[in-house]
From Swiss-Prot:
Record-annotated Brix domain positions: 1-196
Protein name (record): Probable Brix domain-containing ribosomal biogenesis protein
InterPro entries: Brix (IPR007109), Brix_dom_Rbsml_bgen_prot (IPR023548)
Native organism: Pyrococcus horikoshii (strain ATCC 700860 / DSM 12428 / JCM 9974 / NBRC 100139 / OT-3)
Keyword Transport recorded: no
Keyword flag Hydrolase: no
Length: 224
């Protein structure tokens, strides 16, 4: 599904986050970046048969941004970006040493039962970024959705006071609670112009200086 790596000189927490994603995104691989360029990463992803390259960027020791890139020898390109408030690792949720999923199964992306249009829109966006399968929740249980699509792993989009949360479930591990990682998304931006910012959505005013700083911070920590 995707090759997962980081920006240069990642922190231990960022590497752990990458490994956690490898454990909940089927047929994915976490790769230590080293000195590899974007082009070298794309070629490695293509040689391994992946459709996506995910690069995790760091800010003050924590994962700041997730950059998704389409893998194609002649038509590669940036697809979109998730800016994060923070993450909660699997070990912080009580799960250690989970094995990656090497079976051929879809990553099903759905929502909690009572969410707004913003959450539905993001669930569809996240499915595009990951090549996952978006399934509207309705009144269905997670177990019934998983059974219908023959999968053990679901990404559930949920409400959060400071944005949108992605919670991952591994039903082969436990059917009672998510295993993580938990990802708190504050902004998402797609290259085709679609975007969402929790401050704008919640009517929070941002001082001009802070807005300018946040923009530069995101630019300064790009994927290369």
């Amino acid at each position: 599904m995707m090759l997962i790596t980081t920006s240069h000189r990642p922190t231990r927490r960022t590497r752990s986050f990458g490994h956690d994603l490898e454990r909940v995104i089927p047929n994915s691989l976490y790769l230590t970046r080293g000195k590899k360029t974007i082009q070298e990463l794309l070629m490695e992803a293509y040689d391994r048969g992946y459709e996506r390259l995910l690069i995790i960027n760091v800010w003050k020791g924590n994962p700041l941004k997730m950059t998704f890139i389409k893998v194609h020898p002649e038509d590669w390109g940036y697809l979109g970006y998730l800016y994060l408030h923070g993450v909660k690792l699997q070990r912080e949720m009580g799960f250690k040493g989970l094995n990656p999923i090497r079976e051929d199964m879809p990553l099903v992306i759905t929502t909690a039962k009572r969410v707004g249009l913003d959450h539905l829109a993001f669930a569809q966006v996240f499915s595009e970024l990951t090549t996952g399968k978006f399934v509207p929740r309705g009144d269905k249980s997670l177990l019934s959705i998983a059974d219908r699509y023959n999968t053990d792993v679901l990404a559930v989009i949920e409400r959060h006071p400071r944005g949108i949360v992605i919670n991952f479930y591994r039903l082969d591990i436990t059917k009672d609670r998510p295993v993580g990682p938990l990802i708190n998304v504050k902004i998402w931006i797609m290259e085709d112009g679609r975007r969402w910012d929790y401050k704008e959505a919640f009517g929070i005013k941002v001082p001009p200086r802070r807005r300018e700083f946040e923009g530069k911070r995101g630019e300064g920590k790009n994927s290369d």
